[in-house]
Every structure is written in C-alpha cells, then in structure tokens.
Amino acid sequence: MQRWPKYGGTDVNTRTVHDLLNTINTMSARIKTLERYEHALREIHKVVVILKPSANTHSFEPDALPALIMQFLSDFAGRDINTLTHNINYKYDYNYPPAPVPAMQPPPPPPQPPAPPQPPYYNNYPYYPPYPFSTPPPTQPPESNVAGVGGSQSLNQITLTNEEESELAALFKNMQTNMTWELVQNFVEVLIRIVRVHVVNNVTMINVISSITSVRTLIDYNFTEFIRCVYQKTNIRFAIDQYLCTNIVTFIDFFTRVFYLVMRTNFQFTTFDQLTQYSNELYTRIQTSILQSAAPLSPPTVETVNSDIVISNLQEQLKRERALMQQISEQHRIANERVETLQSQYDELDLKYKEIFEDKSEFAQQKSENVRKIKQLERSNKELNDTVQKLRDENAERLSEIQLQKGDLDEYKNMNRQLNEDIYKLKRRIESTFDKDYVETLNDKIESLEKQLDDKQNLNRELRSSISKIDETTQRYKLDAKDIMELKQSVSIKDQEIAMKNAQYLELSAIYQQTVNELTATKNELSQVATTNQSLFAENEESKVLLEGTLAFIDSFYQIIMQIEKPDYVPISKPQLTAQESIYQTDYIKDWLQKLRSKLSNADVANLQSVSELSDLKSQIISIVPRNIVNRILKENYKVKVENVNAELLESVAVTSAVSALVQQYERSEKQNVKLRQEFEIKLNDLQRLLEQNQTDFESISEFISRDPAFNRNLNDERFQNLRQQYDEMSSKYSALETTKIKEMESIADQAVKSEMSKLNTQLDELNSLFVKYNRKAQDIFEWKTSMLKRYETLARTTAASVQPNVE
C-alpha cells in the first residue's frame, strides 16, 4: 500500500499541498488588498487633519468612511479644494510607510540614512477590511408639513446600521432587567456616538445629551448632605461607595454589642429620644465603672491582667496555627513536587501511548488490508480447489481414455508391423508374379494405412502440446506457491514486530498502572489535606470571632479613654486618674493593639498563602485531567455551567472525582487494548493455518503432476484453454477490484484527514477563545488585587490616624 509522508500525524498528499497553495495565494491577495486599503485610508486621514486640524483622529473608525466624510468634510462642500496651499503628498509623509508597489515593479531601494522612529499618531488603531457598502435604490423622502417652521419642508430621516441597532437592543434588554447608573452612562455614550455619525452640526445636541449625566448629582444629593452632617458632628468622613452601608452597620453593631454587655439586654430602636436617652445612660455607666475601677498609681487592673491572659492565649493559638500552616505548606510543597514528577511521567507515558496508538492504527490498516487479501486468497483457493477437483475428474477420464488409446496404439503397431510384413511379402510376390491388379489393391491399402499413421502422428503432436501447456501451468502453480511462502515469511516478520510491540505495551501498561497508583495515593493525600484545611479554616473562623469580640471590648475601653482626654469632657464624679496614668494606660493599650494587629496580619498572610497554594494545586490537577472529563463531572454531579467555572473555585471533591474518572477511562482503554490484541492474535493464527493448508494443497498437486508422466502427455487442449481463460478472467477481476478498493481507501483516508483537520481547527479556536477569557479574567483579578491593596492601604492609614491620641 502507498505510504504518504506525515506532518503532525496527518498524511500529506498532493491534494493537501494543492489546497495549502490555494489558501496561501488567497491570503496573499487579501493582504495586498488590505495594504492598498490601509494606504488609501491613511491618505484620507491626512486630508481630514489638514482640512480640519481640530478633528480627533484617535476616535476615527477605520470601517466608517461615509460617516467620516459626513462628519469632518461636510463644511467644505462648497469650498474649492484646489486653492489649498498644502502639499498633501509631501506633508506628514514621514508618519507613514511607503505605498505598496505593484507586483511587476521591483521594490524601491532602502534609504541610506536610518529613518527616525514613527510617532504613534495615526497608527494607534487596528486595521480592518473595507466596509461592505450596500447601495439601496434611491427613494424619494416623504414630504411633511411642519408647523412652526415656516411652511413645508422635507425631513431627512436617518437609518441606523445593524451594529448600532444590535447595540441599542442589548442596552434596552439590560436596562429592562437591571437598571443601573452604568447602563445609563453606556446609553448616553452610544447615543452621542450615533449623533456624531448621523447628525450634522451636532455640537449643541451632544452637549445637551452629555448633560444627562449631571442627574447623578441630584440622585447623590441626599447622601452628600448625610455625609456632611456626619462629618460636622463626629469629625468622621465617609465616601459614597459600596462600603458606606458596611461602615454604618459596623458602628451600629458595635453600639448594640456594647449595649448588651453593659445593660444585659438587647437594644431595640423605637424613637430618636429613646436612642439619645440610651446613649447617655450607657455612657454614664461605662464612665462610672471605669472611674471606680481605676486606682491612683496602681498597676494595671484585673481587666488588664485578663486582657494579658487573653493576649497570651491568642499568641499561643496563633503560634500553633502558624506551625500548622507551615506543616501544611510543607505538605503542599511535597505534593506539588510529586505532582510535577507525576506530570512528567504522565507526559512520557502519554507520548509513548500516542506512538503505540499510531502503531496500532497502522497495524489496524495492515490488518484490514491482510483481511481483504485473505478473503481474496480464500476465494482464489476455493476456485482453485474446485478447479483441482475438476482436473482430478478429468484426469481420471483422460487416464481411462489414455489406457484405451494405449491399447489402440498397440493394436495399430501390431497392425502396422503385420502390414509391413504383408507389404514385404506382397512386394516379393509382386516381384515374382507381376500381378498388376493385385498391386493396385495393395497400393490402395498402403495409402489408407499411411493416412491412418498420419492421423495418429497428429494426435501425438496435439498430446505433446497439451503436455507442454500443463508443464507451464505447473510452473505457474509453483510460482504461486513461492509467493505464498514469501507472504508467510512477511506474516512471521509482522508477528515478531507485534510481539515486540506487545512487550512494549505491557511494559508501558505496568508503568501506567504504577502512575495510576501514585495518582490515587496523591488523590488520597489531597483529600486529607483538604479535610485538614477545612478544619483549619473553621478554627481560624472561630479565632477570628474571638479576636473580634476581644477587639470590640478593648476598643470600647479605648473610646472611653479618648472621651476622658477630650477638653469638653465633664466628669460626673471626681476623677481618680492623673494625666500621667492616663497616658501610661493609653500607650499600653496602643502597643497591645499594634502587636495584635501585626500578628493578625501575619496569620492572614499565612492563610492566604495556604489557600493560594491549594488553588494552584487544584489548577495543576485540572490542567492534567482532560477537559471532557471535567465537563462531565460538573454536569452530572454539580449541575454547573462549564463556561462559568474557574479551577480555583472547584471543590476538592470535584477534583478527586475528575482524577478518578481519568483513572477509570484509562483502565477501560487498557482492557479494550488487551481484547483487541487477543482478537488480532486469533485471526493471525487462523491466517497462518489457512496459508499452511494452501501450501500443502499446492505441494500435493505439484507432486501429483510430476509423479504421473501420462498426465503430462495426454491432457485435452480445449479444456485446458478454458481453464486458462477462467484463470485470466479471475486475475483481471482481482486487479480491477484491487484498484477500486485502493481508490476507495484513499478517498476514505482523505475524508478522514479533512474531518480530523476540521476538528483540530475547531479545538484550536476553542483554545484561543479560552486563552482570551483567561487573559480577561487575569486582568480582572489583577485590577481587583490593585483596588484591594489601595483599600487596605487607606484602611491602614485610617486606623493609624484613629489610634493616635489627641494631644492638646
């Protein structure tokens, strides 16, 4: 069979090369057309800039030439362009590359001095193909009488493009489902862009439409007044953003918790007077309890000692958690190393598996070809067996005829000898008697006998020619037997190659099973790590709740101290603390808060690092597992849309299920390979037995023909010719059938290559879209991290400013 060269696992034939050349020529023609279009577009932009220097060239749309002309060149409709003193072909030419040269002319020589770098003034937009303009038939605009304008006039109605209509429809749909200020701003931008394209003298209209955005100031008026009032009365400045509600809720939550700690009852808001009364009463109780519990020049109170105990306990707990996090990070590192090792082993096994799969595909093709040849040989053997049986029957008949002919020949020989004797006697008698009549009679008899002898000699010559033809047929049979022996040797060579491939396959199967076992062990370790992480997360949440309560309690005391230090503070009873003691306690609490915040920040960083390492490990496992297995797991078990799933958001159970599905798939493929190998060995053994049987049959026929010389001498020529004709017909049929089958196989192979190439192109397109989505998500994550860092920095500065004491 004909073997085509391969490129990337695909057969490369003349048809593929022809298609590639046609594609290259088409792309080259399109690129030249685009270059000419881009050159003309740059010349138009230069004309626009010269005629109207105030034009914003950065907002030009390359595929909207009519809108460009209507927008920037409508004022010059009645102006004589020839009166311009600018040389367009000379001015600003340094901003553009030279115009494309036709194919028949040689390219211009490059200039000797290096050209200066081109400023990115006109080259900051992507190049698009020419906009496909469609010229509708001219229609007469409807005339309508407009009141208040001064009579009847014709109105020029504009028509939106398909892109503008689709964009407005999408905005309308979004505004119907979820009305937000961002959608309103998008609508205003789209409307301004449409007005700029379709309306002449649109400056006033654009200004009017842009003023719609000032409605936001009316919407935000109440929030602005609220924030200004809060700042005037509390010296705390808020901003109108997504954290405004959270900040206010934090203050309210703090008040309710302090109210519960002091009053031992839940706070319920009814009226403003009640809230004022509760606030004054709560402040009085806290002030009284603090002033009574504080002694002059005394060391820290029982609450301070308890706070130290709590801090030490929290420090110990943070140390334990940090050690545990270090252990988890070490386990993650070891797991990552094992995953990398397994990944390399998996890549090697995958490469070997692909090679074996290609060899198996070649063996399958050879197998199908051998099966086809075997079927043809079986048919030929059947026909030969029938022919041999017919020849045996004919040989039996010919043997009987030969025996009869032998008897006739013996009789003829005896008669000839007797006639010769009679002739000799008659000649003697003639010579003696000279009887003329008797001599004539004898001459007639002699002539008749000579004719009979000639007939017998002709029959002997025919028998000799038949025997020579039978010898040729025997020689041909021997050549066929030799071909069968060569085919048997090639089959034995293929058997050896298959045995070697089977040995390699068994070795790879053992390595693959070992890899699967290691993956299973890694999966178990990952499940244990996930369980440990969940428990650690729960403990972290509990510790965070405890820390929040402690911080709230300490912050309440700190706020009380800050109120005491204010100049407008009027104590109810005589204070028992001096200024030095207050400063001492304030510094002590500030140091404690700073240490606690630093420890909490370290713990948060460690937790974030462990979470990021776990997400990286999940991403690596998901990248190893094929995409179709992940999609099937998500659809069957979690009912989740695949395009909305990120590898970092997958649970550990989903990742484990995907790895298990991958292992099961490879086990099924291994079983299928073993089954196919067994079937192939069985069919190969049957083929060998059939070839051996055919060989023995041909050898027996050859021995029979060589052993019987009478068979070689006395075959009928007519039947042998019929047999020869049938053999030639069968050979021609076999050749024609082989040619047609080869053509069919080539067409099937070409169709398969085309389908596989189309599938490969589809998968490449999907991969490109996935890479685009990945880049977009990565950009969003980077922007989110940047905004979070800015917010954390703002929060840290606000916290530091609030911690500083008010020193007068």
Curated annotation (Swiss-Prot):
Pfam families reported in the protein's UniProt record: Desmo_N
Subcellular location as annotated: Host nucleus; Host cytoplasm
GO cellular component: host cell cytoplasm; host cell nucleus
Chain positions covered by the region annotation Disordered: 132-151
Disulfide bonds listed in the record: none
Biased composition annotated in UniProt, kind: Pro residues: 132-141
InterPro entries per record: Desmo_N
Coiled coil residues, start to end: none
Record's keyword terms, sorted: Host cytoplasm, Host nucleus
Entry keyword annotation includes Oxidoreductase: no
Free-text function comment from the UniProt entry: Plays an essential role in the efficient egress of nucleocapsids from the host nucleus to the cytoplasm.
Assembly and oligomerization: Interacts with the putative E3 ligase IE0 and with viral ubiquitin/vUbi.
Protein name in the entry: Protein Ac66
Species the sequence originates in: Autographa californica nuclear polyhedrosis virus
